[in-house]
Amino acid sequence: MTLKYNPFSCALAMAGLMLGLAGCSVADQIGNLNPFNRGEDIMPGDRRSVLANTGDALAGASLSGSSASISANVALSDWSQPGGNAANAPGNVSLSGGDGALLWRAKTSAKVAKKGVRASAPPLTVGGRYYVYDAGGTVTALAGAGGRQWSVSLKPEGENSLTTGGGIAAAGNVIVAATGYGELVALDAATGGRAWTYDLREPARGAPTAAGGKVYVVTVSNVLHAVNIADGGEAWTYAGIPETAGVLSAASPAVSGNIVVVPYSSGEVIAFDTASGDPKWSDTVIRAVRTAAVSGLSDVSASPVISDGTVFATGVSGRTIAVKLSNGERLWEENVGSAYTPAVSGNSVFLIDLDDNLVALNRSTGKAFWSTRLPVVRKKRFFSVWAGPMLAGNKLWAVSNDGKLISVEPATGQILSDRKLPGPAFIKPTAAGGRLYVLAGDGSLSALR
């Protein structure tokens, strides 16, 4: 295996050494993404954030003079990639009903749920089946109203630990699983039979993305692997800047045409030629002055989105950027960050910022249309966290770790509904076939109208 040298690493590494410390409040929220966080005792005293509140920053910024708008509904039959499609840009997905009522719920990983470790990978909907990858390294296929078709454990023999990295992507009749145990495995979508195994040499950081005959996955030390789907052979690899800390809701690459855009936990966003693996351009979501960031983290934990020739990327360092896909030209940057993949549609970029505000940005300028504070719970041993948004049925949807599902009007930011889910949720909803899907922290998959 030959690793390509990263020509952008030195400058970014030096910049990383100059980053200051951030305050407590945002770190507390992101800390709830940690599946091993059982609610540590919070020290007594008056807690004041030393961060500039993102909502305040937006309020003081020059707001866009127009109104937020979204594109027309798109009938999406499959959610085949972690971000819906290879570009992580599913658009405004059609729903049948759109009121969020529960249709069915199916358990997929009861043993893992009992141990208190949750999955961090989105579920897939492909060809009438639903696929879930859990923290125990098991891929489960469901059909109909959640009936189990097959379940395959990818945990190595003799391995007892659970992991949070990895995930799944679909390519035709193949489900490709990147595991937290250091393997990339191709499974038959109908039977779960193993077709091939590729050695990653270390745990996968997030779910893979499959497109154009290749599957792309990043490991925990920021090595990108491009692997041929047909036979599991290595196409090329690339080593990014190693990063010791990162957010568990890891990002996946985005692919459009002959370019794959890859997010790294170092804060880098690099575009590669899909055929050769040669870098085309590099950018970063790291802020020079980290006044609205998670302490000690520069992670691009949200997947980049490619829409109409523009790459939108964000991270927990507190910056969102828009870049030309073709040449890496920076179009705009805004001092607002997110741990979750933005929803891009119409003239807008929607995201949940690090202060639990749902924000609409002008996709052309980065200026804010509106910012809505989501309902939060702050207790001694529990802080609520929102995951989203998902744009479906002309509404923005988000879920929380205190078991809530809300819908929001995209044009104004008005909260339209607030429903109780069967349990806590940590992964943004997905949508396909007219349904909204929520994977709960206990591994259960719910289908909503």
List each language-model region with its residue ranges.
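Blade-level signature of beta-propeller repeat domains, shared across WD40, Kelch, NHL, RCC1
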Residues: L421-R449
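C-terminal motif of bacterial Sec signal peptides marking the signal peptidase cleavage site
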Residues: G20-G23
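Short loop/turn segments that connect beta-strands within beta-propeller blades
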Residues: A143-G147, D188-T191, N228-G232, T274-G277, ...
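Blade/loop signatures of beta-propeller domains
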Residues: I42-A59, S66-R105
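Bacterial signal peptide processing site
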Residues: S25-D28
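Extracytoplasmic beta-rich repeat domains
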Residues: W104-L124, S151-A169, W196-A211, E234-S256, ...
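WD40 beta-propeller blade core
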Residues: T140, V185, H225, I270, ...
